[in-house]
Amino acid sequence: FNPCPYSDDTVKMIILTRENKKHDF
């Protein structure tokens, strides 16, 4: 059972988005 609803690719995209937001601020 995988508690994470996201696939690995989606998780990577989310992490990249968070990193980009950090750099924006």
From Swiss-Prot:
Q: Where in the cell is it found?
A: Secreted
What EC designation does it have? 3.1.1.32, 3.1.1.5
Name the family: Belongs to the AB hydrolase superfamily. Lipase family.
Hydrolase among the record's keywords? yes
Q: What does the UniProt function comment say about this protein?
A: Catalyzes the hydrolysis of glycerophospholipids such as phosphatidylcholine (1,2-diacyl-sn-glycero-3-phosphocholine) and has a moderate activity to hydrolyze lysoglycerophospholipids such as lysophosphatidylcholine (1-acyl-sn-glycero-3-phosphocholine), but is unable to hydrolyze sphingomyelin. In addition to acting as an allergen, it possesses a potent hemolytic activity on red blood cells of mice (98.8% of hemolysis at 3.0 ug/ml).
The lineage's top-level taxon is: Eukaryota
> What GO molecular function annotations does the UniProt record carry, in alphabetical order?
lysophospholipase activity; phospholipase A1 activity
Activity: how regulated: Activity is maximal in the presence of calcium. However, unlike phospholipases A2 whose catalytic activity is strictly calcium-dependent, this enzyme shows considerable catalytic activity on phosphatidylcholine emulsified in calcium free solution; the catalytic activity of VT-2a assayed in the absence of calcium ions is 18-20% of that assayed in solution containing calcium ions.
Q: How is it modified after translation?
A: Contains six disulfide bonds.
Task: Give me the Gene Ontology terms describing cellular component.
Answer: extracellular region
Q: Its annotated pathway?
A: Phospholipid metabolism
Note, other: Is about 0.95% of the total proteins in the venom.
Q: What is its main location?
A: secreted
Source organism: Vespa velutina (Asian yellow-legged hornet)
Keywords of the record, alphabetical order, are: Allergen, Cytolysis, Disulfide bond, Hemolysis, Hydrolase, Lipid degradation, Lipid metabolism, Secreted
Q: Name the GO terms of the biological process aspect.
A: killing of cells of another organism; lipid catabolic process
Uppermost EC category? hydrolase
Question: Which body tissues produce this protein?
Answer: Expressed by the venom gland.
List the catalytic activities from the record. Answer: a 1,2-diacyl-sn-glycero-3-phosphocholine + H2O = a 2-acyl-sn-glycero-3-phosphocholine + a fatty acid + H(+); 1-(9Z-octadecenoyl)-2-hexadecanoyl-sn-glycero-3-phosphocholine + H2O = 2-hexadecanoyl-sn-glycero-3-phosphocholine + (9Z)-octadecenoate + H(+); a 1-acyl-sn-glycero-3-phosphocholine + H2O = sn-glycerol 3-phosphocholine + a fatty acid + H(+)
What is the protein named? Phospholipase A1 verutoxin-2a
